[in-house]
């Protein structure tokens, strides 16, 4: 893990010095987690001979990126464990602040919730809110596999083909998005996964959307990253119903 300003890599994992879910340890210079929250998440910062001296002919940008004592601000959120392994958990610009003033990093929570087998997409809601909630979409491929016994290797990759295959089984996606049983199944997973987070970060409610997020609706970038502003606009009534 690293950036151009750190002369490429600044951390590395290698055989005998590796931990799944981390980007390894510093292999040159120093790394610190600046101003960590209760969960240990703070800005990842670097210092050492491998760090740039500044941006060419741009002292303003340099001053914004470098601290007075020579630490480079990465703009990334992360944490360091007791063995020195670094985990990247989000971006500073994506930090939510609850109505109680708690800083919440949505990315790590969203990725954790996406580990639920039936969940395709998850977007956390919590900025200036009393508690966290989420929008879920269902993974049609997982429905075909887990609810209809379809061989995972034969599940179509194309979302439209997945929906067509679901219809061949005599079902519509709405039967699952509106299903109390599916909601209860997801709730069991959410309750279990919530244990990984502090109380302000835990999901108190969630809503299953009637369709997956899409590029066509402006909700995903071409590289399939979620576009938070557009999603909040498209599903405003569903979000407000959770509060």
Regions found by a protein language model. Name each.
Residues 1-19, 30-32, 120:
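Gly/Ser/Thr-rich phosphate-binding loop
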Residues 1-6, 49, 51, 55-56, 85-114, 134, 143-180, 199-201, ...:
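Adenylate-forming
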Residues 26, 34, 38-98:
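Conserved ATP-binding/catalytic segment of the ANL
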Residues 31, 84, 113, 134:
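Residue-level signal for inorganic ion chemistry
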Residues 34, 77, 116-142:
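C-terminal boundary motif of the adenylate-forming
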Residues 69, 116, 197:
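Acidic-histidine catalytic/liganding microenvironments
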Residues 121-123, 130, 189-243:
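Conserved C-terminal "lid"/linker of ANL adenylate-forming enzymes
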């Amino acid at each position: 893990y690293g950036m151009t300003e750190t002369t490429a890599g600044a951390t590395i994992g290698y055989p005998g010095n590796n931990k799944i879910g981390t980007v390894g340890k510093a292999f040159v210079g120093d790394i610190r987690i600046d101003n960590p929250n209760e969960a240990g998440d703070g800005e990842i910062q670097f210092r050492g001979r491998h760090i740039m001296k500044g941006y060419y002919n741009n002292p303003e940008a340099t001053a914004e990126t470098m601290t007075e004592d020579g630490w480079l601000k990465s703009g990334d959120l992360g944490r360091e464990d007791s063995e020195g392994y670094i985990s990247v958990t989000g971006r500073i610009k994506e930090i939510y602040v609850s109505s109680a003033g708690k800083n919440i990093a949505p990315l790590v929570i969203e990725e954790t919730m996406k580990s639920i087998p039936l969940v395709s997409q998850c977007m956390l809601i919590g900025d200036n809110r009393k508690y966290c909630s989420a929008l879920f979409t269902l993974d049609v491929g997982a429905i075909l596999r887990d609810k209809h016994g379809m061989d995972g290797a034969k599940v179509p990759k194309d979302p439209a083909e997945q929906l067509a295959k679901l219809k061949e089984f005599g079902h519509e996606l709405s039967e699952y998005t509106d299903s109390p049983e599916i909601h209860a199944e997801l709730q069991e997973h959410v309750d279990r996964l919530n244990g990984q987070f502090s109380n302000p970060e835990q999901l108190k409610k969630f809503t299953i959307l009637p369709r997956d997020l899409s590029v066509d609706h402006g909700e995903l970038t071409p590289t399939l990253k979620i576009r938070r502003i557009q999603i909040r606009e498209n599903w405003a009534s569903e979000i407000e119903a959770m509060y």
